[in-house]
């Protein structure tokens, strides 16, 4: 994407490096993948290539007054120790031909995504106009503080309203507080069975499918989050993917009817369904769901009748619509105050760090013991 800027760094710098998270394809994951941006703690290291400055594309003449780049090296706000040497080329004003977004906004956006990692460093090297009216191209160089770490170039586009960033086939929220709108949406509309706190200041919403094998695997993670974050409200939100899982919608409908009678019974029901997930077949699926209802202490016949009503089907469809509206494309997915993260592939300690960091950005307490993540001051920048 953008050979005029990235091509000059050479094939070695374009080589993708696997991040320790190994996240798949949305927001943090999607952006990291789409932007070829996978530097992080524990990432592969090697000789740092000679980074070169971006080249202004001929198709994007400088029609606006260049921005003045911010401090040359931006570090994460959790890090206390700056790198021994500045691995990036100095930002050149001639590559800042677009008036929006500002360098400060881009840095705030990237800190929202990556600030949980104290080892990651970057510099915004260009914010350029493009042939598409009011669509800007942002170029960032990223690395980490491990000696000899490679510099990764990446680029993404920002929409005219500065609400979204586009990278490859990923469209993600953009801005200084990119997850704020999704957080408000989920606070208003996430109505699944819930555990933990009654308040929604720290809201963890799990989008899940009862017939999804990866969702079954994620339940231990969700149980741990409930224990480790006492101030979090943890919501199970149904997102049955019926094209892949024929019994998922009916299982979700049963789940809604169980929740309607008794919130806590839902989690007994869902655990029983996950435990017998392989039996959700044409021959044994109905009996499997009824047995799960019985384990939850409710009447299977009453739940079955409730699940068949148009009102219940509308409720499940509304939950699906919510998932689609906030950009969920796979299960299991976790929204941490609006920040969408795939639940599989993230080490639990890393996930805990991200939850704590997002809470610190939003100014809310997690209730967890130990030092607050993201509470340290921003370390000094280099190269002034």
Name every feature range the model reports, one short phrase each.
Residues 121, 201, 231-233:
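A generic structural signal for alpha->beta connector loops
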Residues 45-75, 95-99, 107-109, 113-167, ...:
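C-terminal cap of thioredoxin/glutaredoxin-like
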Residues 185-202, 226:
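A short beta-strand-turn-helix
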Residues 9, 14-44:
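Sec-dependent N-terminal signal peptides
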Residues 205-294, 324-329, 357, 361, ...:
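Structural alpha/beta surface segment adjacent to cysteine/selenocysteine redox centers
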Residues 82-94, 251-252:
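Acidic/histidine-rich, surface-exposed loop or edge segments in extracytoplasmic proteins
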Residues 159-193:
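A short, surface-exposed interaction/processing loop segment used at functional sites
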Residues 102, 106, 200, 218-221, ...:
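Stable alpha-helical elements in mature extracytoplasmic
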């Amino acid at each position: 994407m953008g050979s005029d800027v990235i091509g000059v760094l050479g094939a070695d710098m374009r080589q993708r490096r696997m991040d320790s998270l190994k996240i798949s394809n949305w927001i943090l994951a999607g952006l990291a993948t789409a932007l070829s941006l996978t530097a992080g703690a524990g990432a592969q290291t090697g000789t740092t290539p000679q980074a070169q400055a971006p080249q202004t594309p001929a198709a994007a003449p400088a029609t606006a007054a260049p921005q003045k780049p911010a401090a040359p090296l931006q570090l994460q706000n959790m890090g206390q120790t700056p790198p021994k040497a500045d691995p990036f080329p100095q930002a050149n004003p001639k590559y800042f031909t677009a008036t929006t977004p500002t360098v400060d906004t881009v840095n705030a956006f990237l800190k929202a995504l990556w600030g949980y990692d104290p080892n990651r460093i970057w510099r915004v090297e260009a914010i350029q106009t493009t042939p598409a009216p009011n669509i800007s191209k942002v170029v960032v160089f990223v690395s980490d503080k491990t000696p000899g770490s490679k510099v990764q170039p990446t680029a993404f586009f920002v929409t005219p309203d500065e609400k979204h960033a586009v990278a490859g086939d990923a469209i993600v929220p953009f801005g200084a507080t990119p997850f704020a709108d999704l957080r408000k949406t989920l606070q208003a509309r996430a109505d699944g069975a819930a555990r933990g706190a009654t308040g929604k200041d720290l809201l963890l919403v799990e989008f899940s499918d009862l017939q999804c094998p990866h969702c079954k695997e994620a339940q231990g993670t969700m149980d741990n989050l409930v224990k480790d974050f006492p101030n979090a409200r943890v919501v199970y939100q149904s997102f049955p993917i019926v094209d892949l899982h024929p019994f998922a919608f009916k299982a979700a409908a049963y789940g809604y009817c169980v929740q309607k009678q008794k919130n806590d019974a839902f989690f007994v029901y869902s655990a029983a369904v996950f435990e017998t997930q392989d039996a959700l077949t044409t021959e044994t699926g109905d009996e499997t769901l009824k047995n799960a209802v019985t384990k939850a202490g409710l009447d299977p016949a009453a739940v079955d009748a409730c699940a068949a009503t148009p009102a219940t089907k509308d409720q499940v469809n509304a939950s699906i619509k919510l998932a689609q509206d906030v950009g969920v494309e796979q299960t299991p997915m976790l929204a941490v105050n609006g920040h969408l993260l795939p639940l599989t592939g993230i080490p639990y300690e890393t996930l805990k760090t991200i939850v704590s960091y997002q809470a610190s950005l939003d100014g809310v307490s997690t209730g967890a013991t130990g030092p607050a993540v993201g509470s340290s001051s921003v370390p000094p920048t280099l190269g002034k």
